[in-house]
């Protein structure tokens, strides 16, 4: 499973785009729309913290797209105060449904606890071991010196063997197939599944089964 750890800012609306520049979101200039959704203290900053901001581009039917994870996150890299436009690292298509999102430690912590709970419910039993891969931008540096993702897993499964690493990105199963993502945490839990014994046999085989 994947924890994106983003705070969603507002609803997805149709965007007017020119290359990598988002000119409008809904009926408002893109920069105005972004500022409207930001926390008040961030709107007053001399320079916006672009390293924390992203645009979510919805795929398919916009209804419940955010809840179902049918979107890609594209980092914001610049804003034009004269044109009131916002520049992304990748060009969206004109008319795409776009929403704004922000990296936030509390949102990431809540999302990781949600993921751990969902995977535990799907597994249905205590896992034998787990794998946790986190982006360098999501580890202790992001959480003020402690890895709250790791703490969430250990709190739910104390004593469970856990292997992991920090990296510059992760490859994870997304709605549109396996994709490389950033600033996220990927968790897999593994448990034993009992295979049905063959007729007349009293032996039982087990095999490791992942829950991603």
Please place each PLM-identified region on the residue numbering:
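Small-residue-enriched flexible segments
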Residues: 1-143, 147-160, 165-212
């Amino acid at each position: 499973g994947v924890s994106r750890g983003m705070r969603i800012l507002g609803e997805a609306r149709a965007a007017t785009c020119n290359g990598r520049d988002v000119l409008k979101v809904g009926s408002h200039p893109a920069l105005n729309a972004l500022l409207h959704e930001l926390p008040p203290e961030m709107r007053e900053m001399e320079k916006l913290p672009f390293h924390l901001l992203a645009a979510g581009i919805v795929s398919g039917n916009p209804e419940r797209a955010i809840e179902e994870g049918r979107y890609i996150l594209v980092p914001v890299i610049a804003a034009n105060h004269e044109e009131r436009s916002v520049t992304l690292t990748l060009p969206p298509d004109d008319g795409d449904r776009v929403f704004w999102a922000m990296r936030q430690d509390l949102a990431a912590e809540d999302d990781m606890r949600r993921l751990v709970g969902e995977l535990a419910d799907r597994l249905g039993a205590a896992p034998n071991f787990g794998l946790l891969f986190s982006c360098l931008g999501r580890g202790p540096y992001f959480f003020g010196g402690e890895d709250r993702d790791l703490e969430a897993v250990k709190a739910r499964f104390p004593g469970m063997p856990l292997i992991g690493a920090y990296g510059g990105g992760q490859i994870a199963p997304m709605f549109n197939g396996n994709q490389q993502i950033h600033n996220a945490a990927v968790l897999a839990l593994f448990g034993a599944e009992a295979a049905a014994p063959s007729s007349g046999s009293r032996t039982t085989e087990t095999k490791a089964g992942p829950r991603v």
